[in-house]
Amino acid sequence: MIADSTTLRRLFRVPVVLLVGALILTAGAPAEPDSPTWHVYFSPNHGATQALVSALDAARTIILVQAYSFTSAPIAKALAEAHTRGVDVQVILDRRETGTKYSSADFVAHAGIPTLIDGAHAIAHNKVMIIDGETVITGSFNFTTAAERQNAENLLVVRDRALAARYVENWRTHAAHSSRYAGR
C-alpha cells in the first residue's frame, strides 16, 4: 500500500517537531562540564609566573613537570610547598640543569621532590606541567625569571582531561629513560 501525502506529513511531523524543540532548548545551553577551557599569558610582565604559581597552589593530588630551563624561585618554592602539603610532585629536567649556576634542580631535589634528568636527547626542550590529571600548562615559557621579565614568551593553561592524559603518557615515556638526580 502506498501512503498518501497526508499520512506522510503526519509520520514526519512528530520527529521534526521533536528535533526543532531539542535545537531550541539547547541553543543557549552552557558548555558541558568537561569541555576544555583555556587561558593564555604572554611575557614579559603579563602574569605568566603568577598564573603558574596559582595553578601549583591549587593542585590537590599530583604535579608532573618537564623543564628545559628552571631557575624561577617562585615556581620552585610553589612546587616545594605543594610537596609539603602532600601533593605528589615529580620533575624531569634537561641534563644541563645539573650544572647551571642558578638552576632550581638542587632546590627541588633537596626538598625531597623526585627529580629526574632526561639525558636521552640532544636537549629535553619541554616546558610542561600537568596538574591533577586535568590541567596542562605549556608554551615557550621557560620556568625562569628571564622568561617572565625579559623575553617574549607565551604560556597556555588548558583544562582538559583527555589532553592531560596524552601529556601524562608522554611524561612517563621520558621518565622511563631518565636518571634520578639527588642534587649537588
Regions found by a protein language model. Give the residues of each.
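Short N-terminal segments immediately surrounding and downstream of signal-peptide cleavage
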Residues: 31-52
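Surface-exposed, polar helix/loop patches in the mature regions of secreted/periplasmic/lumenal proteins
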Residues: 103-150
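Signature of lipid phosphatidyltransferase scaffolds
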Residues: 131, 136-184
